[in-house]
Amino acid sequence: MSEDTPPVGPVVDATPAQFPGAVTLGGRFGTVERLDASRHAPALWTAMRGQDAIWSYLPPGPFADPTTFNTYIAASEQNQERIFYTVLDNDRRAVGFFSLMEIRPAMRVIEVGNVVYAPALQRTPLSTEAQYLLARYAFETLGYRRYEWKCNALNAASRRAAARLGFTFEGIFRQHMIVKGRSRD
């Protein structure tokens, strides 16, 4: 390389990653599978009803009744830009959900988001395992090389969870979104 050659990044495999799809990811404490509104919405409603705080930093919710909640879950199941997965405990009860989103196969970059865990799932071995199973699927099966976690800068619990799971803090996206009429960094 001559002195006139600017520095550039390392050569990488430019083969695009695969788009996520329907998959069942089994673990020791539970299972992650593609969201199915008809099977999962009733248990998710039972686990999350009255837990308004879990929706504080997310665009949807809280939901006043099961009909409105089921409509949201059904729309999430049909979403082709954000692929939603359900977390099931070993008794096959749906106790949370999340999505793979901001999917950029050509760059091999994907984000986990829309993380909604019922209180029974929060800070448990299953919550950690579910995140691990989804990340492993993204890296090892689909071929992504970057797996992102973004959250509201004010969501201390989400920031702690990201750090505990091994994500590296890279900064704050100022005025990134408007959620429920409020600025979200």
Predicted regions and their residues:
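Conserved catalytic-core motifs of GNAT/GCN5-like acyltransferases
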Residues: 168-183
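GNAT-family acyltransferases
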Residues: 1-124, 137, 141, 182-184
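Conserved active-site tyrosine of GNAT-family acetyltransferases
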Residues: 162
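Conserved GNAT acetyl-CoA-binding A-motif
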Residues: 140-150
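Conserved beta-strand-loop-alpha-helix junction that forms the acyl-donor binding cleft
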Residues: 149-159
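Glycine-rich acyl-CoA binding loop
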Residues: 127
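Alpha-helical, largely C-terminal catalytic domains
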Residues: 134
